[in-house]
């Protein structure tokens, strides 16, 4: 089940706070129809029971469209519902422990801001890295900035795929060209839009150009 580089091309990371009256299910489905290649459920403010219910619904949706479904941080839930994988940050469970819990066949993504963190995550069994924030972001107030030079250095230092995250939108994707990334992870540039399908389609086209 390990992810291929192409699965990371346009990585949708959910945040229901941007949705207004729309349901997360419909927004995620529209984003997949628009070209999202992988989905991460990241809902920090949901109660456990509601998060679990949402996770199962989005998991079924992703199965229907043959898109990998990952859960942010909640390793126990990811194991319980047999999600395709889990993504953890530097302040979550240590990557090596996560790998032991989820087993060798599930996808493990790890956030990194430095070469040291990136190499450590790779050694611990990460399948890909999420590196950022590469641009100012309104989604995570505490996100440390990562320069494009650092992003490039991390891509050169590791053997696993790297996804850029943080403040990515149509107007800045092409500035990531030549960095070595294999895709971008996007939150508000898809899920804050009235038409997530059109937003994803536009981002997909630009991302394909940026990683050539």
Where would I find each of the regions flagged by the language model?
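Conserved N-terminal beta1-alpha1 strand-loop-helix module at the mouth
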Residues: 1-93, 100-127, 143-146, 153, ...
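Glycine-rich beta-strand-to-loop/alpha-helix junction loops that act as flexible
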Residues: 131, 163-168, 184-188
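Internal alpha/beta core interface subdomains
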Residues: 179-183
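Phosphate-binding beta-alpha-beta segment of Rossmann-like dinucleotide-binding domains, i.e.
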Residues: 136-144
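A short, polar/charged loop-to-alpha-helix boundary motif
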Residues: 93-94, 137
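Short beta-strand and adjacent tight-turn residues that come in two discontinuous sequence segments
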Residues: 41, 88, 131, 136, ...
């Amino acid at each position: 089940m390990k992810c291929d580089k192409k699965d990371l091309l346009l990585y949708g990371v959910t945040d229901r706070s941007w949705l207004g009256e729309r349901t997360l299910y419909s927004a995620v489905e529209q984003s997949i129809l628009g070209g999202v290649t992988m989905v991460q459920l990241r809902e920090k403010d949901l109660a456990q029971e509601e998060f679990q219910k949402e996770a199962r619904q989005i998991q079924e949706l992703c199965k229907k469209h043959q898109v990998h479904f990952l859960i942010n941080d909640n390793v126990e839930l990811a194991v319980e519902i047999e999600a395709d994988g889990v993504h953890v940050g530097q302040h979550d469970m240590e990557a090596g422990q996560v790998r032991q819990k989820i087993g060798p066949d599930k996808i493990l993504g790890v956030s990194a801001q430095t070469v040291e963190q990136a190499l450590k995550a790779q050694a611990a069994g990460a399948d890909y890295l999420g590196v950022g924030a590469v641009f100012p972001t309104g989604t995570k107030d505490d996100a440390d900035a990562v320069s494009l030079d650092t992003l490039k250095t991390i891509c050169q230092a590791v053997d696993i795929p790297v996804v850029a995250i943080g403040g990515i939108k149509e107007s800045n994707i092409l500035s990531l060209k030549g960095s070595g990334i294999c895709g971008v992870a996007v939150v508000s540039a898809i899920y804050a839009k009235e038409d997530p399908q059109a937003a994803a389609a536009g981002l997909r086209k630009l991302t394909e150009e940026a990683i050539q």
